[in-house]
């Protein structure tokens, strides 16, 4: 697949032939103790994500430390490649307006020669072909790292400079649209978060009162004797078919002791994950009955719309932590100990007027529906880019 107007064979080159620099940084002497609130940006592997340089949770080093690490100073248009750990193979191009930064030993700097376009080369790294190359080059007993010699030896098919630019421009356009979509989704998430914050902390509202969860929820004690399909619960997808979400079933052969979930029920996982060290709390929007792990708490609702409000409230990890941390005991291997009865005993500030309950639920659900539409657009853009990369870099 090629754009119209371009002819001639692509050349095969080793990366070392088209790069002026292939090396990484190091941990500064003194490690994290030398990090400062201001100074020179110090890039770590977590900053190289989603084909871009993400500067959330950035750390900095003093100018004096940066001067001791001159060989790993980062410039605009450098390619950054993660070369160790779980994020191995992730890469990005340093933005045009980037000022100055440095990297640690887990991030490789690839600085290309003048006739080669980093915004053409980096998408090859992100493509299916590129990821396969990195997987094949991993070294060590656990196959967990890339060395510089193997990176330099990577062979790439490359067109002339003007065709590189054409492809890079097209991919940059898709990336800009992906970035815009991500911002739209983030704004909708912040809107839900802000509304919940405002509503749940307005103690002057006479239509709200402090209630325990057992006033609005009741433990559902129904076992899976009818062998319903086993589902999991995730932060982003909520209650979802286990095979669809995880690729295979992790359920026991006999699931008759699993808990049954009805449409509208609240499910509490009681297991730590990511930003939710005390577990996830989600409402099920699956019309049919499903089964979940016997470790999960399942609660039937006295009012669907109230449970829906709780679903949105507990989508914020801070709210989950504030509600659960005083009633949970953590055991060995980070296990969580809490009874379903204890879960229901704590109190929250909740609406009491039926019309307001439904109104709040409808508002939050409308924003969530808009977010779902925008996420589908984002998924289509990502698939478009993936398809183009597969066709271009077979």
Pin down the residues of each PLM region:
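A short glycine-rich beta-alpha junction/loop motif
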Residues: 100-108, 139-162, 289-295, 328-355
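Non-catalytic DNA-recognition/assembly elements of restriction-modification systems
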Residues: 2-26, 153, 157, 201-224
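Glutamine-centric residue-chemistry signal
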Residues: 46, 105, 122, 131, ...
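A structural feature that tracks compact, well-ordered secondary-structure segments
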Residues: 1-9, 13, 155-202, 347-381, ...
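Sequence-specific dsDNA recognition surfaces
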Residues: 16-31, 46-76, 214-228, 234-266
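PDZ domains - specifically the beta-sandwich core and the conserved carboxylate-binding loop
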Residues: 35-36, 77
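A short beta-sheet element
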Residues: 44-45, 56-128, 259-319, 339-340
């Amino acid at each position: 697949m090629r754009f119209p107007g371009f002819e001639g064979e692509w050349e095969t080159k080793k990366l070392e032939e088209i790069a002026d620099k292939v090396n990484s940084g190091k941990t500064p002497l003194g490690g994290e103790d030398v990090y400062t609130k201001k100074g020179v940006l110090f890039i770590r592997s977590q900053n190289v994500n989603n084909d871009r340089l993400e500067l959330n949770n950035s750390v900095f080093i003093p100018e004096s430390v940066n001067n001791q690490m001159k060989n790993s100073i980062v410039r605009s248009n450098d390619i950054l490649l993660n070369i160790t750990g779980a994020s191995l193979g992730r890469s990005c191009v340093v933005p045009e307006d980037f000022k100055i930064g440095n990297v640690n030993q887990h991030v490789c700097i690839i600085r290309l020669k003048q006739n080669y376009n980093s915004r053409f080369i980096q998408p090859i790294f992100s493509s299916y072909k590129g990821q396969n190359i990195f997987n094949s080059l991993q070294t060590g007993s656990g196959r967990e790292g890339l060395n510089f010699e193997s990176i330099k030896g990577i062979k790439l098919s490359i067109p002339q400079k003007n065709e590189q630019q054409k492809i890079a421009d097209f991919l940059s356009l898709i990336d800009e649209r992906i970035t815009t979509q991500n911002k739209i989704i983030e704004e909708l998430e912040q809107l839900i978060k802000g509304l919940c914050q405002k509503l749940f902390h307005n103690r002057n509202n006479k239509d709200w009162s402090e209630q325990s969860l057992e006033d609005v929820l009741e433990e559902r004690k129904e076992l899976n004797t009818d062998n319903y399909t086993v589902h999991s619960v995730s932060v982003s997808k909520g209650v979802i078919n286990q095979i669809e979400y995880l690729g295979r079933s992790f359920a026991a052969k006999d699931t008759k002791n699993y808990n049954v979930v009805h449409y509208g029920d609240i499910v509490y996982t009681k297991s730590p994950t990511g930003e939710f060290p005390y577990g996830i709390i989600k409402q099920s929007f699956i019309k049919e009955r499903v089964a979940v792990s016997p470790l999960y708490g399942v609660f039937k609702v006295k009012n669907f719309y109230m449970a829906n409000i709780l679903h949105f409230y507990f989508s914020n990890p801070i709210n989950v932590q504030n509600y659960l941390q005083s009633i949970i005991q953590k055991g060995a291997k980070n296990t969580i100990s809490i009874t379903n009865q204890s879960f229901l005993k704590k109190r929250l500030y909740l609406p009491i007027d039926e019309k307001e309950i439904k109104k709040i639920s409808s508002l939050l659900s409308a924003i969530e529906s808009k977010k779902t539409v925008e996420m589908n657009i984002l998924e289509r853009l990502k698939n478009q880019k993936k398809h183009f990369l597969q066709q271009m870099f077979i």
